[in-house]
């Protein structure tokens, strides 16, 4: 049976770990509340942006012969080069949060590799970047400290090169992969095709009440301008959504760790009591034996 001092040392160590995980859970809970509110507001803006683009694209598709003359809305049958931007956390201790994104990226890589399509992998977040570098997967470029602290200007700059390369025909598709926030206990994986814009986003039906007053001759020019903002905001929103999901995942992971530590302390206390009882029993036997031998 383990030495009493060793067991006491283990109890102290696990108890200290329990205090740490409990504190981390409380910190993540506080951060989650702020991140959740920001994600909700950002989601409304993103939805409105999609609505505006859908309406303008729908108008052009309905009214112009030949449809939309914009590569961002054109169906590309045989892509030769694809950009995949992924978002992971800069830190760990958040359960399977990062690995879900990594698995989705690996799946996309395998699918395009099987079709002999060149993939340019662009990473945001230290954990994902380190994983692919460790596994000798080439990264086109990467950045850290952006997923933990979303910055609109840096986010816009990061995705802008992919937007321009798509418009110039250097790439044929742009994907965004990240783990987003669904609720306090659930994260939702997103694999979004940013370009070409999904045709289901816009329909030919005229809206009952338009939110826009745009002259027909200006619609394509406005659409081209808005499509940049659409992609840039999709990038920025993914960072905000990912932060909320990260705090949610870490809160759950630390809650589980705290509960496990609590159970381990209970188990060690039982083990300690048994060891102490055994030691007392041994001492009593030795005393009784000594007394008996003196008779």
Swiss-Prot record:
Q: Which organism is it from?
A: Sulfurimonas denitrificans (strain ATCC 33889 / DSM 1251) (Thiomicrospira denitrificans (strain ATCC 33889 / DSM 1251))
| Location of the protein in the cell | Cell inner membrane
Q: Which UniProt keywords apply?
A: ATP synthesis, Cell inner membrane, Cell membrane, CF(1), Hydrogen ion transport, Ion transport, Membrane, Transport
Give the matching Pfam families.
ATP-synt
Membrane topology note:
Peripheral membrane protein
Tagged with keyword Cell membrane: yes
The domain of life is Bacteria
One of the entry's Gene Ontology molecular-function terms is: proton-transporting ATP synthase activity, rotational mechanism
Main localisation: membrane
Question: Which NCBIfam families does the record associate with it?
Answer: ATPsyn_F1gamma
| GO biological process, any | proton motive force-driven plasma membrane ATP synthesis
**GO cellular component terms listed in the entry, alphabetical order:** plasma membrane; proton-transporting ATP synthase complex
* Assembly, per entry: F-type ATPases have 2 components, CF(1) - the catalytic core - and CF(0) - the membrane proton channel. CF(1) has five subunits: alpha(3), beta(3), gamma(1), delta(1), epsilon(1). CF(0) has three main subunits: a, b and c.
**Protein name as it appears in the record:** ATP synthase gamma chain
Kindly list the organism's lineage: Bacteria, Pseudomonadati, Campylobacterota, Epsilonproteobacteria, Campylobacterales
Give the matching InterPro entries.
Answer: ATP_synth_F1_ATPase_gsu, ATP_synth_F1_gsu
Family per UniProt?
Belongs to the ATPase gamma chain family.
The record describes the protein's role as: Produces ATP from ADP in the presence of a proton gradient across the membrane. The gamma chain is believed to be important in regulating ATPase activity and the flow of protons through the CF(0) complex.
Q: Kindly indicate whether the keyword Membrane belongs to this entry.
A: yes
């Amino acid at each position: 049976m383990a030495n009493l001092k060793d067991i006491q040392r283990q109890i102290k160590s696990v108890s200290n770990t329990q205090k740490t995980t409990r504190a981390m859970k409380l910190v993540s809970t506080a951060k989650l509340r702020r991140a959740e509110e920001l994600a909700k507001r950002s989601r409304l803006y993103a939805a409105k942006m999609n609505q505006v683009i859908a309406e303008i694209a729908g108008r052009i598709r309905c009214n112009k012969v030949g449809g939309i003359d914009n590569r961002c809305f054109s169906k590309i049958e045989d892509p030769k080069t694809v950009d995949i931007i992924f978002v992971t956390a800069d830190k760990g201790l958040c359960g399977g949060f990062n690995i879900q994104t990594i698995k989705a990226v690996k799946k996309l890589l395998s699918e395009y590799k099987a079709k002999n399509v060149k993939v340019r992998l662009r990473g945001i977040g230290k954990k994902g970047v380190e994983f692919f570098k460790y596994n000798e997967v080439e990264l086109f470029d990467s950045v850290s400290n952006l997923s933990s602290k979303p910055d609109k200007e840096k986010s816009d700059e990061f995705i802008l090169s992919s937007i321009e390369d798509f418009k110039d025909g250097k790439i044929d598709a742009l994907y965004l992969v990240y783990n987003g926030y669904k609720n306090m206990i659930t994260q939702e994986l997103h694999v979004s095709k940013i370009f070409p814009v999904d045709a289901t986003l816009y329909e030919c039906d005229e809206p009952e009440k338009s939110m826009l007053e745009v002259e027909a001759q200006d619609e394509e020019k406005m659409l081209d301008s808005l499509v940049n903002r659409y992609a840039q905001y999709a990038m920025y929103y993914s960072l905000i959504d990912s932060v909320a999901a990260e705090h949610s995942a870490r809160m759950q992971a630390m809650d589980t760790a705290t509960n496990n530590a609590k159970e381990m302390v209970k188990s060690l206390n039982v083990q300690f009591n048994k060891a102490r009882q055994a030691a007392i029993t041994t001492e009593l036997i030795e005393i009784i034996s000594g007394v008996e031998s003196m008779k």
